[in-house]
Amino acid sequence: MNFKSITLSVFGLMLGAASMKAIPYSPEYLQENAEAGGNLQYISYGNFDKWLVRHVKESGVIGGETKTLYCIAPNGTWNNNNAYHGAGGSPWATSNVMAKVSGITKTNVSVYREARAGHGYCAKLVTHLEQCKVLGIINIKVLAAGSIYLGQTQEPITDTKNPMAKLNAGMRFNKRPKAIVFDYKVHLSGQPNRIKQTGFGGASTVAGKDYPDCILYLQKRWEDAKGNIYAKRVGTMVHRFGSNTDWKNNASFTIHYGDITKQSFYNSAWALTSGAVTKFAKNSKGKMVEVKEVGWANANETPTHIVLQFDSSHGGAYVGSVGNTLWIDNVRLAY
C-alpha cells in the first residue's frame, strides 16, 4: 500500500512549519472473472456496515480543527485523541491516521464511510491533497492516497523513520481460497499523467495514468531465534482497476498458487516483495521487523498469513491523481 506516502504526508504537513515504485499498467494483467462460484466466506467486518467514528482535534498551530476519522470496527464514537489499535476483533486498518510529534497533533483522512442503497455502508477510498496552514500563513499541500488493509497501524505515529515499519501487515490465515470476491465501483481522475506533491515546492508531473488496485498475498511465515521473520509466497493476486465503472457486484479475482513467474499475466507488480515495498510485522518479541520474502512456495503449500490491501492509487510516495476514487464492499473469499 501507499503507506509511506500517507505517513510522510502527515509529517510533511507538520514539519513543513506507508515508497513503492510505480509499475506501468497493462490490461493483459487483469484477472477478473465474471462470476463468483463456490463457497463464499466473508472476511470479518468485510461488509463494511460497522464503523467506529473518531473525532480528533488537531493542534492549534495548524488550525485546531476537529477531524473525523473512520475505522472499520464495531459501531461507536470516540471524542478524544486516543491512539487506535483496532477494536472488537476487526482485522482491518485504514490510511486514516493520527500523528503526534513535538506536541503537535495532525491527521490524514482519505477513507470514508458511505451509504450504499440496499447494502448498508461501503468503504470509499480517495486520493486527495492533504492541506494545512501553519500559523495561518504557510499553506502546505501533500498528496495522499486512500487505503484499507488487513493489519494494524502503530498509532500514534511519532517519527518519519522507516514508515513501513509503522504497519503490522497481514493476519494469521491457514486456508487456500481459490479467489477473492467483492463489490466495487471506480472513478478515475481522467488525467493522462500523475503528479508528485511532497509539501515542499509545487507539484511535478509523473508520466502515466493512476489506477486504484487490490493486492493479496498468501504467505508461509516463520521466525528464527533472533526474531527475524521470513516468508515464502504461497498465493498471489494483483489487480489494477483500469476504467470507470458503476457498481460491479460479486466480482471474482483468481488467486494463483506457487511460482507464477512463467505465467502469461506475470509482471513486476506480482513479484516477491523487496526494498521499499517490503512488509513489516510484529515478531514474538514484540518488535516490528521486516517480513523477508525469500522465494515461492510449492503450489500445494498451506499459508500461515494473508496480506490484503485496497488502494485508490498505485504509485509511489506522494504520487497519484487527485480525485481517483475506489469504492469497496462485501469482501469475501471463495473456496
Model segments located where?
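Aromatic (Trp/Tyr/Phe) and Gly/Pro-enriched flexible surface segments
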Residues: 24-177, 196, 207-258, 269-334
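Bacterial Sec-dependent N-terminal signal peptides
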Residues: 1-34
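Short amphipathic, basic-aromatic surface patches that mediate peripheral association
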Residues: 184-205, 314-317
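Substrate-binding/catalytic groove segments of enzymes
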Residues: 192, 261-268
